[in-house]
């Protein structure tokens, strides 16, 4: 029986007995319930360590579409859990904390996008995967940072395109493809805080280091980066490169997987720029991703809640651009 307070707060914080091995209990429940744990690179290391699969948005979407498990626990943010449900509607998809949102998804409301579409007839809409199902339902094709260029390159050269909500990613794709897409003015609150100044300061300390930056970073940051791409692109490069030091401009959670795969290499996270208040916060971490905890995962598996549901009408329209993305990538 779900408590009212759990429903109101969007997660279950039921305590466990002292000394409980949460990792072991989670794996036990996964086996009993035919469940798998999917985790994004930005979650905490303990979660990545117990996950059945760790990846970026594109890899997680592919895994969600192909899994035979009855239950998926999506350890990431809400739109990722929605994407899992859209691709596997017959599965139970659990989200450890319904409050795990996304600043990019929040920046683009379905009603606002519909109004913008109506003002620009004849335009196709490309939506970044960091969007709600309702926004995807208004979209022609979805992209991730790992496949955006590849997908856009396959669209007709004369196509009139709207890209959203990530302005920085859209601006980069415009530059490398020569397109003139209309760009939504949304930004990731983490990647927006990385600056050229901080990167150059680190470069003085580590002159031989390779600078890797996520495509959600601002243009000037990408301009000084040696490697520009998704988290999966960064991981692939670090594993194949002979370089021993890397300056990393993306959410700090990726450092766990980078270090696990490349134990003999050094990864230096770029600190956030000092805010206008003069106080420096840990803005190279996504507070939404960090809402996922072992206790919440255990409880959501135990009670099979919070579970994700998508309105059937929205779902039927929203899954099409995701499937088109998977076909094109």
Residue ranges, per PLM feature:
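Active-site loop-to-helix "anion-binding N-cap" substructures in soluble metabolic enzymes
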Residues: 1-248, 255, 260-270, 274-329
């Amino acid at each position: 029986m779900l408590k009212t307070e759990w429903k109101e707060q969007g997660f279950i914080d039921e305590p466990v007995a002292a000394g409980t091995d949460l990792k072991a209990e989670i794996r036990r429940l996964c086996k009993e319930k035919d469940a798998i744990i999917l985790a994004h690179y930005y979650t905490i290391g303990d979660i990545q360590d117990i996950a059945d699969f760790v990846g970026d948005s594109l890899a997680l979407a592919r895994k969600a579409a192909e899994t035979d498990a009855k239950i998926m626990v999506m350890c990431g943010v809400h739109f990722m859990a929605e994407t899992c449900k859209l691709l596997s509607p017959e599965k139970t998809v659990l989200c450890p904390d319904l409050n795990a949102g996304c600043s990019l998804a929040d920046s683009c409301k379905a009603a606002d996008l519909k109004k913008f579409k109506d003002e620009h007839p004849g335009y196709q809409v490309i939506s970044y995967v960091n969007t709600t199902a309702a926004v995807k339902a208004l979209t022609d094709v979805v992209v991730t940072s790992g496949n955006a260029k590849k997908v856009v390159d396959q669209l007709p050269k004369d196509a009139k395109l709207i890209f959203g909500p990530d302005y920085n990613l859209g601006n980069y794709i415009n530059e490398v493809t020569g397109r003139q897409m209309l760009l939504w003015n949304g930004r990731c609150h983490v990647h927006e805080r990385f600056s050229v100044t901080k990167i150059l300061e680190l470069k003085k300390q580590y002159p031989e280091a390779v600078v890797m930056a996520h495509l959600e970073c601002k243009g000037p940051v990408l301009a000084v980066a040696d490697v520009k791409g998704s988290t999966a692109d960064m991981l692939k490069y670090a594993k194949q490169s002979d370089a021993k030091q890397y300056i990393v401009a993306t959410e700090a959670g990726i450092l766990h997987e980078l270090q696990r795969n490349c134990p003999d290499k050094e990864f230096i996270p770029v600190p956030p720029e000092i805010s206008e208040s003069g106080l420096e916060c840990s803005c190279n971490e996504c507070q939404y991703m960090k809402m996922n905890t072992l206790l919440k995962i255990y409880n959501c598996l135990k009670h099979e809640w919070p579970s994700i549901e998508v309105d059937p009408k929205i779902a039927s329209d929203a899954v099409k651009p995701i499937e088109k993305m998977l076909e094109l990538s």
